[in-house]
Amino acid sequence: MNITLFRATKRPNSSTYQAAKYLISKLSDVGTVYEFTLPEDMPHICLGCYACINGKEDKCGGYAYLEKINRAMDDSELLIFCAPVWCFHAPGQIKSFLDHYGYRWMVHRPNFAMLHKQAVIISTAGGGGLKETPKDIKDSMDYWGMARTYVVTQAVWGGFWNNMSEKFKTSLLHKLDKTAVRIEKHAKHLTPSLKVKALYKMFERLHLQGKMLPVDDSYWKETLKK
């Protein structure tokens, strides 16, 4: 199982990053792990130029950065997002990164390979924001067509991995253990969740009926012919 990991901070004692490393250690047959730190590995902020929406994603100012990330995701069966809560929501660099993939939502031109991949969102917080932060990312995962997305959250009261209370760390590790089991269980016979199936069927019907943007309808029709 190859993995692509996204992190929002370079801090080595980051609770979300260390949690991700622990999760990976609990998975069997792990192959290549691609790591990207945001914003360093994707510094270009979406400008709303509409190039990608219009089918010209190679004209995006951040395309050179996205190419490398896209290759890693294509080669991975699992994506992991380390998303600490910042001001009750996902870090801006993660939101900015996901904005570049609006054209990959099923309403436009999804990468259908996502229907055969899984994702994990790990969020920690000093207090609030543990519902809002993973939702910021899970919305994209569901509309990308990600087969299964798991959310792991833990309040840590501002503690980092090296000074987190044993109570919080024990709770977090237990959740990660359970998530690792779920990932491997579903990987054997991976099927999309009911929500993703429903979204896929709805957009498939709309695109095949030619009711969406022409560039998107053509993409669906041509891709499904293959």
Model-derived regions, located:
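Active-site/pore-lining binding-face segments in mid-to-C-terminal subdomains
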Residues: 139-195
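A short secondary-structure junction signal
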Residues: 92, 130-135, 163-164
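N-terminal beta1-alpha1-beta2 submodule of the flavodoxin-like/Rossmannoid cofactor-binding fold
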Residues: 1-110, 170-226
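Short, glycine-/small-residue-rich phosphate/pyrophosphate-handling segment
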Residues: 110-154
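Glycine-rich beta-alpha junction loops
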Residues: 42, 126, 155-158, 201
